[in-house]
């Protein structure tokens, strides 16, 4: 094999193995550290847009509670196609990277649980 073919093969493999795009980076990859200045609020959802998306099938709001896999959550699936990360809720809670969704409820992108850290007095502190 000539040196030229070897070099082309090497750089070809290098190009294929080092690509990392926003939507498909591996955990711990080049873009795994999120710049918290770039995190935006997740899109509104639910009746009269009074809630916020916590996952592709979860919409929660203080006034309306939480919806799971209903027509109120359809808009949340749009988040999968947006290039920048988002965050709903203000106070972190739970053991799985969740945020307080409403009084007493902690949600991450997959599920919601009851959490005393999210009681009414401290939800937005």
Curated annotation (Swiss-Prot):
Any one cellular-component term (Gene Ontology): extracellular space
Lineage top rank: taxon: Eukaryota
Gene3D superfamilies in the record: Neurohypophysial hormone domain
Tissues showing expression: Mesotocin is produced by magnocellular preoptic neurons in the hypothalamus in amphibians, reptiles and birds.
InterPro entries linked: Neurhyp_horm, Neurhyp_horm_dom_sf, Neurohypophysial_hormone_CS
Cleavable signal peptide: 1-19
Record bears the keyword Signal: yes
Cystine connections: 20-25, 42-86, 45-59, 53-76, 60-66, 93-106, 100-118, 107-112
Keyword Kinase: no
SUPFAM superfamilies: Neurophysin II (SSF49606)
Pfam families reported for this sequence: Hormone_4 (PF00220), Hormone_5 (PF00184)
UniProt keyword list: Amidation, Cleavage on pair of basic residues, Disulfide bond, Hormone, Secreted, Signal
Location(s), subcellular: Secreted
UniProt cross-references to SMART domains, sorted A to Z: NH
Gene Ontology molecular function: any one: neurohypophyseal hormone activity
Transmembrane residue ranges: none
Record PTM Glycine amide, positions in chain: 28
The family this protein is said to belong to: Belongs to the vasopressin/oxytocin family.
Known function: Mesotocin is a diuretic hormone.
Name this protein carries in UniProt: Mesotocin-neurophysin MT
Natural source organism: Bufo japonicus (Japanese common toad)
